[in-house]
Amino acid sequence: MTKELSIGSVKMGGGRLLVLIAGPCVIESEEATLRHAERLMTICNGLGMPLIFKSSYDKANRTSINAFRGPGMDEGLRILSKVKESLGIPVLSDIHSIEQVAPAAQVLDVLQIPAFLCRQTDLVVAAAKTGKVVNVKKGQFLAPWDMRNVVGKVAASGNENIILTERGASFGYNNLVVDMRSFPVMRSYGYPVVFDATHSVQLPGGQGESSGGQREFVETLSRAAVATGIDGIFMEVHEDPSCALCDGPNSIPLAELPALLKRLQALDAVVR
């Protein structure tokens, strides 16, 4: 069994109910962010599912220089603070440099280390030293057992509030595959493990100047991951993915989310 973490009002791990981490890929505007957060809260309250809202203030690893990156740290944190205060739900976002750690920690309940940066010791240690929950996404280039060393970096910094997230492994060019063995391997380190269901079906750079995606496989992979006993599911969602400013091809339409979550909850109840 994994360690139980307290994230605002949400409990994750330790045999608790499956937690949803969800939101638009990037903060598109204050109005859109609050609207998505309110809809997600309504959906999760109706299902009795714990929710952590996520959205990025800066997508620093977009495929093209012309791609929308978000409002930036200052404005993004202001918007996420408003979500947190007005709706009372925990919030998560990515950090990309040591300089971002302190201001982000003043607002965020979870500091997320992006997959491409999971080996950056100084960033991981700086995040850990805040005492905040740190969600480290497993790099597409790492084996699941390599995450033991990442866990060691966080724990050695005096922080055991750790989440590990699987988001697929590189499988040739412009493709990812999910190795289901990664879930029991990473859970064996004693901390909650999350499946990033939407980034795992991404086709990185697959559309030339942007990434493609195969959202039709999200449910299949999510069901398999939940059946292994994971602690949380991570999904990027949008009210209209065709108009999303980031990762639309692999985002889940909000209208389809309740039925999908209900099916995943049923599986979670069996394996709990």
UniProtKB/Swiss-Prot annotation:
Subcellular location per the Swiss-Prot or TrEMBL entry: Cytoplasm
Gene3D superfamilies hit by this protein: Aldolase class I
EC nos: 2.5.1.55
SUPFAM superfamilies cross-referenced by the UniProt entry: Aldolase
Main location: cytoplasm
Enzyme class: transferase
Gene Ontology terms for molecular function: 3-deoxy-8-phosphooctulonate synthase activity
Domain of life the protein comes from: Bacteria
GO biological process: keto-3-deoxy-D-manno-octulosonic acid biosynthetic process
Similarity annotation: Belongs to the KdsA family.
PANTHER family per record: PHOSPHO-2-DEHYDRO-3-DEOXYHEPTONATE ALDOLASE
Protein name: 2-dehydro-3-deoxyphosphooctonate aldolase
Organism for this UniProt entry: Trichlorobacter lovleyi (strain ATCC BAA-1151 / DSM 17278 / SZ) (Geobacter lovleyi)
